[in-house]
């Protein structure tokens, strides 16, 4: 019989060993949630493009109306130990680049939204004051080489958002998405 402690260790191991799959699943959930919410708000001019690989620092290009966002997504367990993430400096060159750090439960439910970015049309906040990231594996001499294009962002560099509506507001400057939904729900029970 499995104890609670064993179950937690097993879940954490599953998350660690399948992190790429986990990130793909959460990316699909996040995109679906954003598109569904925009649909509920009557906003239908939406496009989502996926990068084949992360050379330019973004995972998604999200367009809504005339706002285009290059988004790098990060995912971690809400009660996990992850205190920082690496950001590709190329993201600063992308139009309206931003990073969204999603906190998920063991069942991949998104419960936390963190934001690092600026208003649409503006560049990322300056990354020069942040430490340079290092490779996870050391070379033959035991040295972990620097990753010149990567900077470390601690959790404190991110703004914790109230939820999906505030995230959509940051991405696309759609004000008071939450209030619009309440009005819609009241008119259309």
Question: Could you say what each language-model-derived stretch is?
Answer:
Residues 1-56, 61-189:
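Mixed-charge (Asp/Glu-Lys/Arg
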